[in-house]
Amino acid sequence: MNWGSISSGTPGLFVESIRNTPSVVKINVIFLKVISNTAVSVFWRDRRIRFESDWLNSYFQK
């Protein structure tokens, strides 16, 4: 990394961001959990609906 190209303000921001990391990480983890839970529930609901419609179709075609 070329430290000469970094402006004098950046190291301070860098230290500040390191100090604030835990809350940011917590927010990201919560955000990821919400997204993954939503994705999983949507995925399973979609699968279940498709499965039920396939099952009904095959049942009525007999």
Swiss-Prot record:
Belongs to the asfivirus C62L family. This is Uncharacterized protein C62L. It comes from African swine fever virus (strain Badajoz 1971 Vero-adapted).
